[in-house]
């Protein structure tokens, strides 16, 4: 394998773009803290961090395999390794299988409940790339997939999925729909041309209102989580800071343009970090 091929594999796995990894990792780590009522055992942190990174790359590979014909028509994606011919579909499938096995080995160190949930997580990871063909809001499926680690974190530590896990899961789904709609704005014109469905296409000229609506719902659910878990004022301070980030982002993505939308999307990882820090503060 030469240097060019290694670079192509690196690009296929999206390791040069860590922001989506953080968007998955922060809610998962927050769930570990909530489930542990404090800092979790280091083994859980290692297993779930590896799992997030590996499954994010698996999702990217599946997405590129599914979209290889569509990506040729989109300026932002027509240089990807599969689309440009740097790697074959066979190469991608073998890498995907190998990484999935790595993730499965990690989950074998957890309890049976979590192992069973991992199959649901894999199903969602496979479903998302294909639902863009028939489902009007694929961002909902992405929200289910990206944040499923919340359920797995609670099941691994508590062997159950309590009410607070469901509240937090719903909050992160709303958050994901909002930030991925911003991301989809960058490709909306191309998606309209080639028939790909997205929330950015569905919401049309009301898209900014819907992004703000889902931002609001995520904040509301976080407040409900704080009340249910009897969190102190520091948690609500974090919610206020998140709301300010959402307002700041609004003035960025409303300008449209690929750069503005991608920057607004990327800034969302700070939301995840803030909530994680506020959760940790509750137990120190």
Swiss-Prot record:
Keywords: Cell inner membrane, Cell membrane, Magnesium, Membrane, Transferase, Transmembrane, Transmembrane helix, Ubiquinone biosynthesis. Catalyzes the prenylation of para-hydroxybenzoate (PHB) with an all-trans polyprenyl group. Mediates the second step in the final reaction sequence of ubiquinone-8 (UQ-8) biosynthesis, which is the condensation of the polyisoprenoid side chain with PHB, generating the first membrane-bound Q intermediate 3-octaprenyl-4-hydroxybenzoate. Its cofactor is Mg(2+). GO terms for cellular component: plasma membrane. It is found in: Cell inner membrane. The keyword Cell membrane applies. The chain crosses the membrane at residues 19-39, 42-62, 85-105, 107-127, 134-154, 165-185, 211-231, 233-253, 261-281. GO terms for biological process: ubiquinone biosynthetic process. It is an enzyme of class 2 (transferase). CDD domains: PT_UbiA_COQ2. It catalyses: all-trans-octaprenyl diphosphate + 4-hydroxybenzoate = 4-hydroxy-3-(all-trans-octaprenyl)benzoate + diphosphate. Belongs to the UbiA prenyltransferase family. Its EC number is 2.5.1.39. The keyword Ligase does not apply. Its main location: membrane. InterPro entries: HB_polyprenyltransferase-like, Prenyltransferase, UbiA_prenyltransferase, UbiA_prenylTrfase_CS, UbiA_sf. Pathway: Cofactor biosynthesis; ubiquinone biosynthesis. This is 4-hydroxybenzoate octaprenyltransferase. GO terms for molecular function: 4-hydroxybenzoate polyprenyltransferase activity. It is a multi-pass membrane protein.
């Amino acid at each position: 394998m030469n240097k060019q091929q290694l670079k192509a594999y690196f690009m296929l796995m999206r390791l040069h773009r860590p922001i989506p990894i953080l968007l998955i990792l922060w809610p998962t780590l927050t769930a570990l803290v909530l489930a542990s009522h404090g800092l979790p055992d280091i083994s859980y942190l290692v297993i779930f961090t590896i799992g997030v990174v590996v499954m994010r790359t698996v999702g990217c590979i599946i997405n590129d395999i599914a979209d290889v014909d569509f990506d040729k028509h989109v300026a932002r994606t027509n240089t990807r390794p599969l689309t440009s011919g740097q790697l074959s579909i066979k190469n991608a499938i073998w890498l995907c299988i190998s990484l999935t096995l790595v993730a499965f080995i990690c989950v074998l160190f957890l309890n049976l409940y979590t192992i069973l949930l991992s199959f649901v997580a894999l199903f969602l990871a496979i479903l998302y790339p294909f639902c863009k063909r028939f489902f009007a809001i694929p961002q909902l499926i992405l929200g289910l997939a990206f944040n499923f680690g919340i359920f797995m974190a609670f099941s691994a530590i508590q062997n159950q999925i309590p009410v607070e896990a469901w509240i937090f899961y719903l909050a992160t789904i709303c958050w994901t729909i909002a930030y991925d709609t911003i991301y989809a704005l960058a490709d909306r014109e191309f998606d309209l041309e080639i028939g790909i469905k997205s929330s950015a296409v569905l919401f049309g000229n009301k898209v900014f209102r819907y992004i703000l609506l889902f931002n609001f719902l995520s904040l509301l659910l976080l407040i409900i989580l704080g009340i249910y878990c009897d969190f102190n004022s520091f948690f609500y301070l974090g919610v206020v800071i998140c709301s300010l980030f959402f307002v700041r982002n609004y003035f960025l993505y409303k300008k449209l343009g690929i750069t503005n939308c991608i920057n607004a999307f990327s800034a969302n990882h700070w939301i995840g970090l803030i909530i994680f820090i506020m959760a940790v503060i509750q137990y120190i």
